[in-house]
From Swiss-Prot:
Biological function: ATP-dependent specificity component of the Clp protease. It directs the protease to specific substrates. Can perform chaperone functions in the absence of ClpP.
SUPFAM superfamilies: Glucocorticoid receptor-like (DNA-binding domain), P-loop containing nucleoside triphosphate hydrolases
This protein's name: ATP-dependent Clp protease ATP-binding subunit ClpX
Positions that bind Zn(2+): 13, 16, 35, 38
Entry GO CC: HslUV protease complex
Residues annotated as binding ATP: 119-126
Keywords carried by this UniProt record: ATP-binding, Chaperone, Metal-binding, Nucleotide-binding, Zinc
GO terms of molecular function: ATP binding; ATP hydrolysis activity; ATP-dependent protein folding chaperone; protein dimerization activity; unfolded protein binding; zinc ion binding
Domain ClpX-type ZB: 1-54
Family membership noted in the UniProt record: Belongs to the ClpX chaperone family.
Subunit structure: Component of the ClpX-ClpP complex. Forms a hexameric ring that, in the presence of ATP, binds to fourteen ClpP subunits assembled into a disk-like structure with a central cavity, resembling the structure of eukaryotic proteasomes.
SMART domains named among the record's database cross-references: AAA, ClpB_D2-small, zf-C4_ClpX
Length: 416
């Protein structure tokens, strides 16, 4: 039984040593005292540990349908790729949960790392980011072109894991269930299929270096990065439950696909149904592992990527939808920024299509839309905060193509 110490002679907290004059309250027990500050601290520690335990237990994996529904809120089009990614991610984390709970029925479930092929600006990185956000797991992006095999100047492959650790605030257990997206993976392809004549060390060597972490290994990760601190203690991270998604544009692989399909690409041959479906827009969806091998990825590397999907090139209609439809669409973001200045913002259909056409002309895809709309909006966002008489700003096609002034609808005009 605990009792109040008010009125007692001076006593001290048995935990922190503070006297009752230094704290608001001290509670006495049989031969022990505890102050209000230590009670609060104990409660915080217990609450935090309970929350962490619950989070570990409650790692519910959304169904593929739920994942696609979430992706639809942020990513326009690419229906086939969304389904493929949703199923692969669901199976991966179902496997992780089974391994953690021991419910694997003595059957070894292998990793389902993913290769995503798609033109620049088609949404490869954004899809991977969105998956990590939906699953609430740490996420890191690496650029394959910066990686080198051991012994050469550049980044070690272990630095990829370091980025994931940093995203997880160095919580190793969380990092071991994260997602890593490796971009520009096509840039580490061998320069020639005949390695005895041309051995591309920076390409094939990096592929070889990535094999172990893709499959699952205990990686020794330098917390300070790289080779500049050889005396640092390494952090051990098990990569067997980390989902790796690799992406690249694979420029020129269309030619390899067309050569393999031969006459079928123009509608001849026995499999006419498949032939009629092959177009310049969807040809990447017909890429098979043999095409990647011919492109320059080594067989062992391709074997670590059992799931493969392709993104279609975005056309004008796709880019207009990307500008306007997602929850975080660029148009909605800029409308909110202008609303915070007390005005409204409208883009005409001509303006939206002009921005989409400009992104296509620059071959930047969706990723180029931000810089285009920022350029269009720069003067508006500079002038508007100093004006209180503007009811609405209208951006039309000429604002995009000729950099003309937008139309300002003044509050007095609306009233009249």
């Amino acid at each position: 039984m605990f009792e109040d110490t008010t009125g007692m002679d001076s006593v001290h907290c048995s935990f922190c040593g503070k006297s009752q004059d230094e704290v608001k309250k001290i509670v006495a027990g049989p031969g022990v005292y505890i102050c209000n500050e230590c009670v609060d601290l104990c409660k915080q520690i217990i609450d935090q540990e309970l929350a962490e335990d619950e989070a570990k237990k409650a790692f519910r994996v959304p169904t593929p349908g739920e994942i696609v529904n979430e992706l639809d809120d942020y990513v326009i089009g690419q229906g086939d790729a969304k389904k493929t990614l949703a199923v692969a991610v669901y199976n991966h984390y179902k496997r992780v949960n089974a391994m953690m709970s021991g419910d694997n029925n003595d059957t070894e479930l292998q990793k389902s790392n993913i290769a995503v092929i798609g033109p620049t600006g088609s949404g490869k990185t954004y899809l991977a980011q969105s998956l990590a956000r939906i699953l609430n797991v740490p996420f890191a992006i690496a650029d394959a072109t910066t990686l080198t095999e051991a012994g050469y100047v550049g980044e070690d492959v272990e630095n990829i894991i370091l980025k994931l650790l940093q995203a997880a605030d160095f919580d190793v257990e969380r990092a071991e269930k994260g997602i890593i997206y490796i971009d520009e993976i096509d840039k580490i392809a061998k320069k020639s299929e005949n390695v005895s004549i041309t051995r591309d060390v920076s390409g094939e060597g990096v592929q070889q270096a990535l094999l172990k972490i893709l499959e699952g290994t205990i990686a020794n990760v330098p917390p300070q990065g790289g080779r500049k601190h050889p005396q640092q203690e390494f952090i051990q991270v098990d990569t067997k439950n980390i989902l790796f998604i690799v992406g690249g544009a694979f420029d020129g692989i269309e030619t390899i696909v067309k050569e393999r399909l031969g006459d079928k690409t123009i509608g001849f041959g026995t499999d006419s149904r498949e032939a009629e479906e092959v177009t310049d827009k969807n040809i990447l969806q017909h890429v098979i592992p043999e095409d990647l091998l011919k492109f320059g990825l080594i067989p062992e590397f391709i074997g670590r990527l059992p799931v493969m999907t392709a993104l279609e090139k975005l056309d004008e209609d796709d880019l207009v939808r990307i500008l306007t439809e997602p929850k975080n669409a660029l148009v909605k973001q800029y409308q909110e920024l202008i609303r915070l200045d007390g005005s409204q913002l409208t883009f005409t259909d001509g303006a939206l299509r002009a921005m989409a056409q400009l992104a296509i002309k620059r071959n930047t895809g969706a990723r180029g839309l931000r810089s285009i709309i920022e350029d269009v909006m720069r003067d508006v966002m500079f002038d508007l905060p100093s004006r209180k008489d503007v009811e609405k700003v209208i951006i039309d096609k000429r604002c995009v193509t000729q950099h003309t002034e937008p139309r300002y609808v003044l509050k007095d005009e609306k009233a009249s």
